[in-house]
């Protein structure tokens, strides 16, 4: 056993789990009418109902003790202070500085980074104003109304999904298109109907060498030049978010149109940096600032609220409870709001890239489960497909249901139906339906006894399936910022308990490295193949098909 699993608190939780597995939530609700109010907390515009979880007061007490013993609070404070907590890359982790509205300095290696952060935000503000006012024009004098944002990973998911989620707040007159996949179909589809004279390309790559992003940007450049632009005109139509100023200027971009990035901001946390420029172009700068404000308020909540009231702490500990003591391998996110449909994919990268690790900080292989599979879809679509597995499958799959209570400019009938389905699903998962209830429902249906018993058996729902429900007054920029930051800090807490580095991604780096090696063999068709027999055969087949 490692130190974590050998602790008395871990053993207490294991014992409590065995006890809880013999109980049913429907009985808890029947015997305690205050359960819903007891297990509910509100902060930063988010109402968290966690009463439909397999928890008791004793379970929560032990989970809070686990967090204390894992020094979660101390690790949290070290992150906010700018200590080197990404130990494998020897970096601070300070995406929180990008939404720091406190007026207090934030230090990295003894230097206050806030002047740089504020200068970048001012640059974003001025740039957005110049686009929205029509002051900034293309080489023929047309206003730049079509924005093509090219990135991948955090440089794509964050801007795209935040922009989608806030569609009611879009600025009228500018349209932002997002491109990530190196599959040429994607960039071709986006560019096909655009006028190059009113198109601005935003290339987001810290190194300016990210394979997919660079190729898509080169394709956009060829499209621009073939449509009538010249190399000299590139500076008016292409800008970058990058640390590699030389590569960007060599490409043809003006140095004034290059926005900075910092090593202390990881890609999956980068939407708060200039990577979020497409969000500001989509929403307007004031709404973009509200997004940052919401995240800042969640940061303050995370730092100051006691564990029993702390939304990131509560959601993280519930996840640890199911992953490590109930064998849960996945967690499903179910936003009952069409514009939030991409949110599961955002959290998927955030969580799985952060905590998909098997080595603890002291280089010991862990002997317990870490990051779960994150997946999900918008409600009510999922009810007609994969919810069946959650209801009657053999796997325990904790769920997060999300619902804005009010939606601007929508028929109330639609929203009432949406809400009823959301709440009904949480009840059905918790309560289930007993054999006796199913058997009684079949009375008078013309079935003989054997058929009635058989069908009732198939219709029985075990229930006892855990879920959180997160309600918002409405999904505005500030609330979305708080929601994203809540999940960021949830992931941090879980990584702190498991003792893994939540801020590197060596699996991603290996994929890039091998992808480049294979590309070299595909392009250089005379080169000898030196991989395993399967990979060699796949490359040979591709060469043959494209000869």
Curated annotation (Swiss-Prot):
The places in or outside the cell where this protein is found are:
Cytoplasm
Q: Which residues form the active site?
A: 353 (proton donor), 384, 512
Q: In which pathway does it act?
A: Carbohydrate biosynthesis; gluconeogenesis; Carbohydrate degradation; glycolysis; D-glyceraldehyde 3-phosphate and glycerone phosphate from D-glucose: step 2/4
Presence of keyword Cytoplasm: yes
Annotated GO molecular function terms are:
carbohydrate derivative binding; glucose-6-phosphate isomerase activity; monosaccharide binding
Reaction(s) this enzyme catalyzes, per UniProt: alpha-D-glucose 6-phosphate = beta-D-fructose 6-phosphate
- Gene Ontology CC terms, in alphabetical order: cytosol
Superkingdom as given in the UniProt entry: Bacteria
Key words of the record: Cytoplasm, Gluconeogenesis, Glycolysis, Isomerase
Protein name, as recorded: Glucose-6-phosphate isomerase
| Species of origin | Pseudoalteromonas atlantica (strain T6c / ATCC BAA-1087)
Kindly report the protein's main subcellular placement as a broad class: cytoplasm
* Pfam families in alphabetical order: PGI
The cross-references to HAMAP family, in alphabetical order and at most eight, read: G6P_isomerase (MF_00473)
Q: Which family does it belong to?
A: Belongs to the GPI family.
EC number(s) in its UniProt entry?
A: 5.3.1.9
The protein's role, per its UniProt record: Catalyzes the reversible isomerization of glucose-6-phosphate to fructose-6-phosphate.
**What's one GO BP annotation on this UniProt entry?**
gluconeogenesis
Q: Does the keyword Signal apply?
A: no
């Amino acid at each position: 056993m490692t130190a974590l699993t050998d602790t008395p608190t871990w053993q207490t939780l294991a014992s409590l789990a065995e006890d809880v597995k013999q109980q049913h939530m429907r009985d808890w609700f029947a015997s305690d009418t205050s359960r819903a109010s007891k297990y509910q907390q509100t902060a930063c515009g988010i109402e968290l109902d966690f009463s439909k979880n397999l928890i008791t007061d004793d379970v929560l007490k032990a989970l809070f003790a686990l967090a204390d013993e894992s020094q979660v609070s101390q690790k949290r404070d070290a992150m906010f202070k700018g200590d080197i907590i990404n130990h494998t890359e020897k970096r601070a982790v300070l995406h929180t500085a990008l939404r720091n509205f406190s007026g207090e300095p934030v230090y990295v290696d003894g230097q206050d980074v806030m002047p740089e952060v504020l200068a970048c935000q001012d640059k974003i503000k001025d740039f957005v104003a110049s686009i929205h006012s029509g002051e900034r024009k293309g080489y023929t004098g047309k206003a730049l109304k079509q924005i093509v944002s090219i990135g991948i990973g955090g440089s794509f998911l964050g801007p795209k999904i935040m922009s989608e989620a806030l569609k009611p707040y879009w600025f009228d007159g500018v349209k932002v298109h997002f491109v990530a996949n190196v599959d040429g179909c994607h960039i071709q589809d986006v560019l096909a109907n655009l006028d190059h004279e009113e198109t601005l390309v935003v290339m987001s790559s810290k190194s300016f060498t990210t394979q997919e992003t660079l190729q898509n940007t080169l394709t956009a450049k060829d499209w621009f030049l073939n449509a009538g632009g010249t190399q000299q005109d590139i500076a008016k139509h292409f800008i970058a978010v990058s640390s590699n100023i030389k590569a960007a200027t060599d490409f043809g971009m003006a140095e004034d149109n290059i926005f900075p990035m910092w090593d202390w901001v990881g890609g999956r946390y980068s939407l708060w940096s200039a990577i979020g420029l497409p969000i500001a172009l989509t929403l307007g700068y004031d709404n973009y600032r509200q997004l940052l404000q919401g995240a800042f308020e969640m940061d303050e909540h995370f730092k100051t609220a006691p564990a029993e009231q702390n939304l990131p702490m509560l959601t993280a500990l519930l996840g640890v409870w199911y992953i490590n003591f109930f064998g849960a391998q996945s967690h499903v996110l179910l936003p009952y709001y069409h514009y939030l449909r991409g949110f599961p994919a955002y959290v998927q990268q955030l969580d799985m890239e952060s905590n998909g690790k098997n080595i603890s900080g002291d280089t010991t292989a862990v002997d317990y489960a870490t990051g779960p599979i994150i997946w999900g879809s918008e409600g009510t679509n999922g009810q007609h497909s994969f919810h069946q597995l959650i209801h009657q499958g053999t796997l325990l799959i904790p769920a997060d249901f999300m619902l804005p209570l009010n939606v601007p400019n929508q028929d109330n009938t639609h929203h009432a139906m949406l809400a009823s389905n959301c709440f009904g699903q949480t009840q059905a998962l918790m309560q289930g339906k007993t054999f006796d209830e199913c058997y009684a429902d079949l009375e008078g249906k013309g079935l003989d006894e054997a058929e009635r018993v058989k069908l009732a058996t198939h219709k029985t729902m075990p229930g006892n399936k855990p879920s959180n429900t997160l309600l918002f007054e409405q999904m505005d920029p500030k609330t979305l910022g708080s929601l994203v930051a809540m999940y960021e800090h949830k992931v941090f807490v879980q990584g702190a308990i498991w003792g893994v580095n939540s801020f590197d991604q060596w699996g991603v780096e290996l994929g890039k490295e091998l992808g480049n090696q294979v590309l070299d063999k595909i392009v250089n068709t005379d080169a000898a193949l030196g991989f395993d027999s399967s990979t060699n055969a796949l490359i040979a087949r591709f060469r043959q098909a494209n000869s």
